[in-house]
């Protein structure tokens, strides 16, 4: 199979180094922890497949989006899988060393959803084996029967990586 590698080029500060709008699912590697079916784990398409929102994200990227689904807790009994880790990783490394020796890098993305007692982590890796958590969803309140709310649609998450990256990556 052919997988198009996203273009990576040197950029000035304040310029996008890499972006993706999920139009090519081959840019991503999905590990759904042995779960199968559209109702478990990550999927990339233009359809909202989850139980919570039929509308999906109001993304400025248009087209496809990546969506994480874990069963349906509103059914009796609930169908969500327990003790699983779902991962979505870029298929090819994003070479930030192309910035010319600076660690002034931010990771920004749009998201929509809610925190249902689950932890969402954003991780980076220098070697593709060891990952470091650089962000999570603990800044969001839990949405439960006793209160809380979904994220804004879309919610823009921006993570400054300068504190994580070496001075000259």
Regions found by a protein language model. Name each.
Residues 4-76, 136, 148, 152-154:
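Extracellular glycan-recognition surfaces and repeat-rich motifs
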Residues 115-121:
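Short coil-to-beta strand junction motifs in C2/discoidin
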Residues 75-99, 155-158:
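Short beta-strands within extracellular/lumenal beta-sheet-rich domains
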């Amino acid at each position: 199979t052919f997988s198009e590698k996203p273009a990576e080029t040197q950029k000035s500060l304040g310029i996008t180094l890499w972006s993706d709008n999920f139009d090519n699912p081959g840019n991503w590697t999905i590990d759904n922890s042995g779960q199968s079916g559209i109702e478990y784990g990550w999927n990339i398409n233009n359809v909202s497949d989850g139980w919570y929102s039929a509308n999906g994200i109001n993304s400025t990227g248009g087209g496809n989006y990546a969506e994480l689904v874990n069963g349906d807790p509103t059914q009796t009994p609930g169908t969500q899988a327990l003790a699983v880790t779902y991962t979505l990783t870029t298929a090819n490394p994003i070479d930030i060393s192309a910035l010319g020796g600076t660690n002034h890098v931010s990771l920004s993305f749009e998201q929509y959803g809610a925190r249902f007692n689950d932890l969402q982590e954003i991780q980076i890796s220098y070697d593709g084996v060891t990952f470091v958590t650089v962000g999570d969803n603990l800044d969001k309140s839990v949405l439960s029967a006793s209160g809380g709310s979904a994220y804004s649609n879309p919610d823009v998450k921006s993570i400054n990586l300068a504190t994580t990256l070496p001075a000259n990556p």
